[in-house]
């Protein structure tokens, strides 16, 4: 400010009443070092413009001089003096102040004028500086504490009252005058009671300071003063801004405030005048101007709006923002993200529109608004708020007797069910989640409303839990209907939820296809939230397929995008995926990423916190820190209980932890539950863990069966993440029955697969692995061990799997036909079809040529074929068995 005054002769401090303009002007003036001093002209008590000059003359110590005008006396007195004149409180005398300033600045070349006013004086060369409110986190709190200690000595801000004081300062917008009024109440009220009483702030903050000017005796008087200076048209616009909360733009003002007595084209001019008069604040928000009322000013405007009888202004406000919300459900191509961002910006106005509708019994409109905001509830992590909106009406008996169209109620019930499913307030598939969805479906079918029906079908599919068979018919019908009515957003949600089910399937190929289909549609409508989730599914599919480098790169990319977009749910899931991949890579960074996941998840709560702790469980397990893994797991379990997929996967982790802790019985139970409830990659991992449990319990046959089943599961779906664990288990089991060469070859194949995919063995299994390696090396000797290891490492992944499967043992098979062939016989047929001789086949299978011929003899007998040529022809016709 000193620099401004040094470079400019007229500076005006502007701002709302009570913001501290006068106080700041006095501080600036006191620090002035102008040679001839300063004078302070208090215009607050002056009501007649004709005596402004006389007031200034008295301030500089000039007596009345007969025969000479006051202005002339001032000009002569000030002359060439280097001095500062403060004109305080000019807003009600702008013309007179302007005339005085013109005269004095023109005649007195060394004079500088500092003015305070609720609006600019409006002169050429005037520099306007808006006095901001105090920072509510420090300055305002310090002021409250200072003023409170004056009326209640010993008052301090501590843990028990800090939040309440912060709330007071926030709700009073950091306005010093209002904060001083509030602090004065400490003599008879606690800060918490003061904060609660601010709903009626004008009554609460009515006790001013004796000796202050009248307009600063109470908060109401301060705003009354500004309001009285408005023209009638300005007063009309001012009160019609009252329904807006948090901010608004020009288009919204024109839609809500314009009318027969306020031309839409004049709104901008009138709004600008309200900004000039410090009743409206104008902010630059990323190149766009948004306006807002300070909360105390807005409450005053609400009173004026109520007194005017213009209740329709609230309805127009509600209708404008309801239309904005409705546009979310019908996005043009690639427009969804922009609409969601705009709705997020207007969330306070949307909340106000909903609250006004509910409080005034406009239930249909309130439910429509809540349903239209599903993209916000999901895409911006406002899930609990969305559910609370629906519950505040659907579970309130007062509203049951009010007429609401069946279609609107059906959609509301469906949308509530979807939110409940996501939040998992009960186990997914529970009655209190399914019932609203089924009720919505019955109602939607009754009225034949396609939009309500597609939402209800989607809700039924979602609320079926992770039972793909139960959800499939709902999703199928919903998909067809959404395509028929061109409801792209709902179709995207359907594909999204089907993708969630595919995640549970554990099939990387199916997940990749589902993710790509949903992502493409999401990108078409611009739904980056869903698109990011689909990309995370693709990284998951990469992980299952053993492509850990690609999985890590993609999950990092999506996490960074989510963080930049303030998409916390996707950020949490991205960090979880990263932590999991890093754990399988053996990277120490997994721990830090898991910690970041927990920190981000804490912001959301609920199942996300459970996911964060699950990430830490993976990281700790991989590092061999069983204690830390148990702590993280114990924190995750109760949170994840309502999410079947997460609970099941956590049972796999619990089985590993129990086994590492020596509790094989508990480990077996966890593993059994996981095997029974999972498919695909999840089941492969669960089977491998159960095989470890069986090995630890001295049950080699059970261990062998489960390890082979895990291998078969992975081979069928091309799942390679975790496959080396199954191979190493089979290697150890082979060594125990004397099949040393087979065991070492499997170890070599597993090591090669680990190197190829970058996956490491969790440290908690290292001891068992090293024991198997040591036993096999001792049994074979170094030279034979190394040769067998190299033979296994040279196998391709498919060859290694086939080699491992040959040792599975006999199963019940038909006596004849292709189904009767053993795994080894199938390998022989495949290699014969490739044109290999018996000698070459023997080398590939690590057996003798005579053994190959024996297998062929069995094959000819089982298939009823007389020769090698016919076997090749028949294999080609049927497709070579694998």
Curated annotation (Swiss-Prot):
<keyword id="KW-0805">Transcription regulation</keyword>
<dbReference type="GO" id="GO:0005829">
    <property type="term" value="C:cytosol"/>
</dbReference>
<dbReference type="GO" id="GO:0003677">
    <property type="term" value="F:DNA binding"/>
</dbReference>
<keyword id="KW-0238">DNA-binding</keyword>
<feature type="domain" description="HTH luxR-type">
    <location>
        <begin position="814"/>
        <end position="879"/>
    </location>
</feature>
<keyword id="KW-0804">Transcription</keyword>
<dbReference type="Pfam" id="PF00196">
    <property type="entry name" value="GerE"/>
</dbReference>
<dbReference type="GO" id="GO:0009274">
    <property type="term" value="C:peptidoglycan-based cell wall"/>
</dbReference>
<dbReference type="InterPro" id="IPR011990">
    <property type="entry name" value="TPR-like_helical_dom_sf"/>
</dbReference>
<dbReference type="InterPro" id="IPR036388">
    <property type="entry name" value="WH-like_DNA-bd_sf"/>
</dbReference>
<dbReference type="GO" id="GO:0006355">
    <property type="term" value="P:regulation of DNA-templated transcription"/>
</dbReference>
<dbReference type="InterPro" id="IPR016032">
    <property type="entry name" value="Sig_transdc_resp-reg_C-effctor"/>
</dbReference>
<feature type="DNA-binding region" description="H-T-H motif">
    <location>
        <begin position="838"/>
        <end position="857"/>
    </location>
</feature>
<protein>
    <recommendedName>
        <fullName>Putative HTH-type transcriptional regulator Rv0890c</fullName>
    </recommendedName>
</protein>
<dbReference type="InterPro" id="IPR000792">
    <property type="entry name" value="Tscrpt_reg_LuxR_C"/>
</dbReference>
<dbReference type="InterPro" id="IPR027417">
    <property type="entry name" value="P-loop_NTPase"/>
</dbReference>
């Amino acid at each position: 400010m000193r620099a401004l005054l040094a470079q400019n002769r007229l500076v005006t401090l502007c701002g709302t009443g009570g913001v501290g303009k006068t106080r700041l002007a006095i501080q600036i003036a006191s620090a002035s070092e102008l040679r001839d001093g300063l004078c302070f002209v208090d215009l607050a008590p002056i009501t007649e413009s004709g005596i402004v000059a006389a007031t200034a003359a008295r301030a500089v110590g000039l007596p009345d001089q007969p025969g000479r005008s006051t202005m002339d006396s001032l000009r002569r007195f000030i002359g060439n003096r280097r001095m500062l004149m403060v004109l305080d409180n000019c807003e009600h005398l702008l013309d007179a102040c302007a005339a005085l300033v013109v005269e004095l600045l023109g005649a007195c070349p060394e004079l500088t004028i500092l003015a305070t006013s609720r609006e600019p004086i409006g002169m050429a060369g005037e520099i306007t500086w808006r006095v901001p409110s105090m920072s509510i986190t420090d300055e305002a709190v310090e002021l409250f504490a200072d003023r409170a200690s004056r009326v209640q000595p010993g008052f301090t801000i501590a843990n028990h009252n800090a939040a309440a004081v912060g709330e007071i300062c926030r709700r009073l917008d950091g306005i010093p005058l209002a904060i001083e009024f509030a602090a004065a109440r400490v003599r008879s009220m606690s800060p918490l009671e003061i904060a609660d009483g601010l709903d009626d702030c004008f009554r609460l903050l009515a006790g001013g300071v004796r000796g202050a000017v009248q307009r600063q005796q109470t908060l109401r008087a301060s705003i009354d003063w500004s309001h009285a200076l408005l023209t009638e048209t300005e007063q009309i616009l001012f009160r019609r801004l009252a329904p807006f909360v948090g901010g608004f733009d020009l288009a919204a003002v024109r839609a809500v405030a314009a009318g027969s007595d306020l031309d839409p084209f004049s709104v901008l001019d009138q709004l600008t005048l309200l900004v000039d008069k410090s009743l409206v604040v104008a902010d630059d928000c990323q190149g766009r101007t948004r306006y807002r009322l300070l909360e105390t000013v807005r409450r005053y405007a609400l009173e004026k709006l109520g007194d005017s009888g213009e209740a329709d202004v609230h309805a127009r406000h509600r209708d404008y923002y309801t239309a904005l919300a409705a546009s979310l459900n019908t996005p043009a191509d690639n427009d969804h993200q922009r609409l969601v961002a705009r709705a997020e910006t207007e969330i306070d106005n949307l909340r106000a529109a909903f609250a006004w509708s509910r409080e005034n019994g406009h239930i249909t409109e309130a439910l429509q608004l809540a349903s239209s905001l599903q993209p916000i509830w999901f895409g911006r992590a406002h899930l609990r708020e969305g559910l609370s909106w629906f519950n505040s009406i659907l579970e309130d008996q007062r509203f049951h007797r009010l007429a609401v169209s069946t279609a609107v109620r059906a959609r509301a019930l469906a949308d509530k069910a979807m939110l409940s499913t996501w939040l998992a307030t009960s186990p997914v598939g529970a009655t209190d989640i399914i019932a609203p969805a089924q009720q919505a479906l019955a109602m939607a079918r009754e009225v034949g409303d396609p939009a309500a029906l597609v939402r209800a079908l989607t809700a039924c599919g979602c609320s079926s839990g992770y039972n793909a068979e139960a959800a499939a018919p709902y999703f199928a019908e919903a998909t067809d209907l959404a395509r028929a009515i061109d409801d792209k957003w709902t179709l995207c949600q359907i594909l999204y939820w089907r993708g969630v089910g595919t995640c549970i399937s554990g099939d990387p190929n199916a997940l990749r296809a589902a993710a790509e289909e949903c992502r493409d549609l999401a990108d078409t409508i611009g739904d980056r939230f869903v698109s990011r989730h689909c990309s995370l599914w693709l990284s998951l599919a990469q992980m299952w397929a053993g492509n850990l480098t690609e999985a890590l790169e993609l999950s990092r990319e999506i996490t960074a995008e989510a963080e930049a977009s303030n998409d916390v749910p996707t950020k949490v899931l991205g960090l979880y995926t990263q932590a999991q991949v890093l754990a399988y890579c053996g990277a120490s960074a997994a721990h830090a990423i898991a910690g970041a996941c927990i920190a981000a998840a804490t912001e959301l709560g609920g199942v996300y916190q459970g996911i964060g702790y699950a990430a830490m469980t993976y990281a700790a397990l991989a590092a061999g820190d069983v204690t830390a893994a148990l702590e993280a797991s114990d924190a995750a379990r109760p949170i994840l209980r309502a999410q079947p997929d997460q609970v099941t996967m956590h049972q796999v982790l619990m089985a590993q932890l129990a086994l590492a802790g020596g509790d094989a019985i508990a480990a077996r139970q966890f593993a059994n539950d996981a095997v029974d409830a999972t498919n695909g990659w999840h089941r492969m991992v669960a089977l491998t863990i159960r095989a470890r449990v069986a090995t630890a319990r001295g049950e080699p046959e059970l261990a062998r069966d489960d390890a082979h089943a895990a291998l078969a599961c992975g081979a069928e779906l091309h799942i390679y993440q975790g496959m080396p664990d199954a191979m190493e288990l089979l290697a150890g089991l082979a060594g125990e029955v004397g099949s040393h060469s087979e065991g070492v070859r499997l170890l070599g194949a597993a090591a090669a697969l680990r190197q190829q995919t970058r996956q490491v063995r969790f440290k908690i299994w290292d001891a068992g692995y090293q024991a198997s390696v040591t036993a096999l090396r001792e049994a074979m000797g170094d030279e034979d061990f190394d040769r067998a290891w190299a033979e296994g490492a040279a196998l391709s992944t498919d060859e290694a799997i086939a080699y491992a499967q040959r040792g599975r043992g006999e199963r019940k098979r038909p006596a004849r036909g292709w189904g009767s062939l053993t795994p080894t016989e199938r390998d022989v047929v495949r290699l014969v079809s490739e044109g290999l001789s018996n000698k070459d086949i023997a080398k590939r299978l690590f057996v003798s040529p005579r053994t190959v011929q024996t297998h062929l003899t069995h094959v000819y007998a089982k298939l009823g074929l007389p020769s090698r040529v016919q076997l090749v022809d028949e294999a080609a016709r049927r497709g070579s068995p694998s």
